[in-house]
């Protein structure tokens, strides 16, 4: 089981049908296919269990996990520039004249098409977890752009996907700032030794504290001077550590060894059973963490 490393959390803004049987067919229509000779990038669905299953969905306890795969052709700008300059120089020498800008632009497309078939590919995979019980969708990535790209693929596959980023009633950065100022987080959470503080003024600067006592006078002085906490490392019930960000995302998830070893009695050779058990364990813990976090941050924004 690929334990999630980050969480971008989204709320379904209205109820839609998310049944695995239907989704299996819908995702199949957008299954991953490799780039053709003239494709810059391709994205599609692959089995979350990899070579161990052909299914594009894996379901347990109302939780669904799916996996998007992306192939991108790598064409460094200097390579394109060098090939283009050589092509321009050759044509200008042959025709004994300087090429116009429109001609150079047209040549750039030609050069791009000639280089694409020989370009290397970069592959990446993004896991997505659909919590049909709580109406949430979680994407395992650190950037909003990557999450939005994956959601866009799912929206295209399903025909409709009404989601909004999970947001709180109170600004998250103000709640995090109060936790650091008071030296105490919400029930179930403990402050760790890492935070990022930003000034409310545009040119006020950023402070990144690592391996530091966040209740120290130095940190308090930054808060008194008008800085707010935009990232804060937290521990949840000594089970999961993570960095809470002011955009509502959870970064650098770290599950405690005791939690990760809970299914060690299952033979690792039985990949399907271990994957299923780890998925149930992980989603159960994260669902509880998210609910606890929503309460601790003052409740979800009313829609």
Curated annotation (Swiss-Prot):
InterPro entries: RdgC. One of its GO terms (biological process) is DNA recombination. Keywords: Cytoplasm, DNA recombination. Coiled coil: none annotated. It comes from the Bacteria. It is found in: Cytoplasm, Nucleoid. The keyword Cytoplasm applies. GO terms for cellular component: bacterial nucleoid; cytoplasm. This is Recombination-associated protein RdgC. It comes from Shigella flexneri.
């Amino acid at each position: 089981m690929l334990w999630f490393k980050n969480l971008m959390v989204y709320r379904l803004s209205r109820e839609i049908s998310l049944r695995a049987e239907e989704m299996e067919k819908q995702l199949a229509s957008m299954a991953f296919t490799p780039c053709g000779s003239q494709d810059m990038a391709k994205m599609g669905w692959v089995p979350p269990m990899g070579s161990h299953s052909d299914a594009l969905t894996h379901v347990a306890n109302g939780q669904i996990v799916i996996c998007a795969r992306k192939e991108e052709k790598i064409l460094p700008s200097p390579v394109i520039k060098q090939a283009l300059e050589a092509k321009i120089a050759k044509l200008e020498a042959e025709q004994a004249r300087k090429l116009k800008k429109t001609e150079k632009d047209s040549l750039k497309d030609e050069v791009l098409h000639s280089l694409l078939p020989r370009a290397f590919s970069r592959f990446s995979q993004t896991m997505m977890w659909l919590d049909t019980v709580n109406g949430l969708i979680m994407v395992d990535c650190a950037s909003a752009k990557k999450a939005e790209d994956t959601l866009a693929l799912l929206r295209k596959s399903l025909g409709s996907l009404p989601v909004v980023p999970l947001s709180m009633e109170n600004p998250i950065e103000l709640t995090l700032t109060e936790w650091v100022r008071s030296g105490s987080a919400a029930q179930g959470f403990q402050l760790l030794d890492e935070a990022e503080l930003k000034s409310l003024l545009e040119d006020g600067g950023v402070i990144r504290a690592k391996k530091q006592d966040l209740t120290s006078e130095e940190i308090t002085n930054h808060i008194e001077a008008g800085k707010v906490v935009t990232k804060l490392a937290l521990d949840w019930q000594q089970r999961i550590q993570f960095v809470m960000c002011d955009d509502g995302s959870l970064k650098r998830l770290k599950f405690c060894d005791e939690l990760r070893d809970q299914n060690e009695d299952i033979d690792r050779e039985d990949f399907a059973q271990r994957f299923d058990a780890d998925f149930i364990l992980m989603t159960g813990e994260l669902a509880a963490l998210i609910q606890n976090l929503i309460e601790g941050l003052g409740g979800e924004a009313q829609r």
